[in-house]
Amino acid sequence: MPNFSGNWKMKSSENFEELLKALGVNMMLRKIAVAAA
């Protein structure tokens, strides 16, 4: 598996909440993450 560690800048947050949901992140953490993004 490639090493993806490092600094990343978010280019867009389109469907970000759906991605978090698919990854199994609970609703409260998703709302916080989307608000911060």
Curated annotation (Swiss-Prot):
Location relative to the cell: Cytoplasm; Endoplasmic reticulum; Nucleus
InterPro entries: Calycin (IPR012674), Fatty_acid-bd (IPR000463), ILBP (IPR031259)
GO CC, alphabetical: endoplasmic reticulum; nucleus
SUPFAM superfamilies assigned: Lipocalins (SSF50814)
Organ and tissue specificity: Embryo.
Protein origin, superkingdom: Eukaryota
Entry's Gene Ontology molecular function annotations: retinal binding; retinol binding
Chain positions of motif Nuclear localization signal: 21-31
Keyword annotations from UniProtKB, A to Z: Cytoplasm, Endoplasmic reticulum, Nucleus, Retinol-binding, Transport, Vitamin A
Stated role: Transports retinoic acid to the nucleus. Regulates the access of retinoic acid to the nuclear retinoic acid receptors.
Record-stated family: Belongs to the calycin superfamily. Fatty-acid binding protein (FABP) family.
Domain text: Forms a beta-barrel structure that accommodates hydrophobic ligands in its interior.
UniProt-recorded name of the protein: Cellular retinoic acid-binding protein 2
Organism per entry: Gallus gallus
Lineage of producing organism: Eukaryota, Metazoa, Chordata, Craniata, Vertebrata
